[in-house]
């Protein structure tokens, strides 16, 4: 990141214009030759992957892959406005979707999650009341809001990720997701779906 700009703000500034123009997680999928040169971690992953015997390489932010994967759970696909979460080992991402449209998301450090704060975050997220700088000040990774769905319109809240049991005491009716029948495949499913959309392959049944 340039001097005076935090790494998290710099990453946020990469994501926002892309999502403003194409509000779907798969918009943040990069073919090997498309990875921005200033995204050091993605470039390092790309360079490692290029050593494998493959005709093409795709790279995607793991949080974006996970929330896309969570939306492919059959129960989410059968509903209207939804909140999906991926509670991973290091980071937790919560996102609001209407169909394939990513309306908002927030990213937090999993170790800092407290049930009461996560409950309020989910409502604030859907109501469009979360600000990026506010989340950074709390020690989180940031937030993005394109439009507010309204918490009262949410039809399902679904969680994936290896540490989702941390949300067991939530006051919200959080369902446990398993795209492709396996909670631990969430990110893989999201990456596969992003590549499928890019390549124009036939739809894949993930339930």
Explain the meaning of each model-derived region:
Residues 95-122:
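Catalytic or ion-translocation cores adjacent to nucleophile or general acid/base/metal-coordination motifs
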Residues 80-99:
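Gly/Thr-rich phosphate-binding beta-strand-loop-beta motif of the actin/hexokinase/Hsp70
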Residues 54, 91, 101-103, 154:
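A broad structural signal for short, well-ordered beta-strand segments within beta-sheet-rich domains
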Residues 1-82, 108-115, 133-207:
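Nucleotide/phosphate-binding catalytic cleft detector across ATP-hydrolyzing
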Residues 120-121, 125-130:
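A charged amphipathic helix-loop-strand protein-protein interaction module that recurs
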């Amino acid at each position: 990141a340039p001097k005076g700009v935090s790494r998290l703000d710099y990453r946020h500034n990469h994501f926002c214009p892309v999502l403003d123009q194409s509000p779907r997680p798969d918009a943040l999928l990069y073919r090997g030759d498309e990875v921005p040169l200033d995204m050091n971690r993605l470039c390092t992953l790309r360079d490692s992957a290029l050593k494998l015997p493959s005709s093409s390489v795709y790279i995607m932010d793991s949080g974006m892959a996970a929330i896309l994967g969570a939306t492919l759970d059959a129960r989410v696909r059968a509903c209207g406005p939804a909140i999906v979460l991926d509670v991973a080992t290091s980071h937790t991402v919560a996102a609001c979707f209407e169909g394939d449209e990513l309306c908002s998301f927030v990213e937090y450090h999993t170790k800092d999650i407290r049930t009461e704060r996560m409950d309020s975050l989910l409502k604030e997220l859907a109501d469009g009341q979360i600000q990026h700088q506010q989340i950074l000040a709390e020690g989180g990774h940031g937030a993005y809001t394109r439009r507010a769905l309204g918490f009262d319109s949410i039809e399902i809240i679904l969680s994936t990720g290896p540490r989702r049991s941390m949300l067991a005491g939530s006051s919200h009716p959080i369902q446990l997701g398993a795209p492709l029948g396996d909670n631990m495949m969430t990110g893989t499913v999201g990456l596969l779906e992003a590549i499928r959309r890019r390549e124009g392959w036939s739809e894949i049944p993930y339930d």
